[in-house]
């Protein structure tokens, strides 16, 4: 059976007038309008001409746009809401703050950083600030919070984007985030059902199943979703994640070949989520360009299958003409039932009614705050102060086994060498970060202001790339043939700080060491020069440098984070962060420090 929505019940709680609007709106739709209302558009322009044209052509229900300046986003959303026939859901990815809605918004911190403050108040503040800044420019939905469990340190997608590894903490912080953002008129779509963070692959690029048994899943992810549903969670994003062992227990007659990811799987969405867990809200697919979805079925089939399986909104067109045609064909040939089509429309329109969008007919411009008033809510001193507090409280001293290494003062360590440690450099991340101030430059400035002499090491590969092409082969050969005195390091530096800046962007989230031998590129010198490692992105860098005795997770390289880091290194501030994940990565050697006093 298909579980149909009850708009009078949680999370909608609609009155008769609102339900009448939902039903009358559906009754007055053409088939093309009904099909259009299944889609979430990703716009390629903010111009009025483009926005009005695509709304007329494709009649979509919702938008998820790329962030821009608040002034531009306000204009975009004003056009969308005043020119659309039916009010639009306008979503952003406010996972870490208002910066997910507008580029001049406030980043409070990724979820793992918020969790490291060890204070649920900051999860609420994250939601609240994100809600204030997003709603100011006309957003009314967000694809957050992330409720995955960080149980595999090799996972490249949610390493710093999830609250942590423990069920209770994820529940507590997700509820607080939801409370903060819903207070400000934003519908949260929690993700990624049925649960990421167990497999080490990226469902943007590959299948990435969750291998849990049903009892394991019910005690972990199932419990998280049950608690959030009970708390009134209005939206869920279905990930392109298989749940094969759970599905096999529910349907022993099925083979693995019969099983699809959750975004295309009626058993997982209708029987499990809506049936056993009692979810009555709306479901959006994760992005439909991801290989976890596109490699599962021909696109002509996966479009109607996603809706028939229980999704109410389909995230992003590929080619809009093609996608709309195929969704309509799927309805006409029975792949998408009339019952499921109309249930999806009720759930989506129900969210719009829950937000009160139906009450603005004839005065749509009043949905938006006046522009000047809206822009005054972006990047306020209050929001920046919350971000500063999180930066101060979150930084975590994970490993501190070198006796008396801290504090870092000019009297103890006059000459400091900063060594940048990086990962995959390709992809869009490299293009986006071009020209941005590096964490090492910011750290250098702050340390020099305190009286240190600071150098930044140019890694061996980068140096060789600058040589004339004909000289490079000999230089590379020399890397492996040459040896150099340790005194080249010990005579010149009193302290070395390895700054690990490795973020997602490839199939793996690991340090990629440059070709080098005897240079500071890799921290072989931990017993030659006092050495500190600081990760300014993902919290699992210790796996690739277990030999170090002092390791710190800063979680990001925001200016206030680097400033707080320097205060803590110097002893002016205490380390108070508490890791919500296993920074030792379940490995034995990451906890070891070979003291120089051994064997004496």
Model-derived regions, located:
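Active-site mouth loops of central-metabolism enzymes
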Residues: 37-47, 111-125, 206-220, 289-297
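Short, well-ordered alpha-helical
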Residues: 2-10, 14-100, 147-161
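Active-site-adjacent structural elements in enzyme catalytic domains
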Residues: 70-87, 120-136, 341, 346, ...
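Hydrophobic faces of well-ordered beta-strands that scaffold small-molecule active sites
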Residues: 35-43, 61-65, 88-96, 141-145, ...
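Short glycine-enriched loops at secondary-structure junctions
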Residues: 41-47, 92-100, 140-150, 190-196, ...
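Second-shell residues forming the walls of enzyme active-site clefts
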Residues: 30, 72-86, 98-100, 165-340, ...
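Catalytic domains of carbohydrate-active enzymes, especially glycoside hydrolases
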Residues: 51-66, 125-142
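Preference for extracellular/luminal or secreted protein segments
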Residues: 1-57, 265-266, 275, 295-600
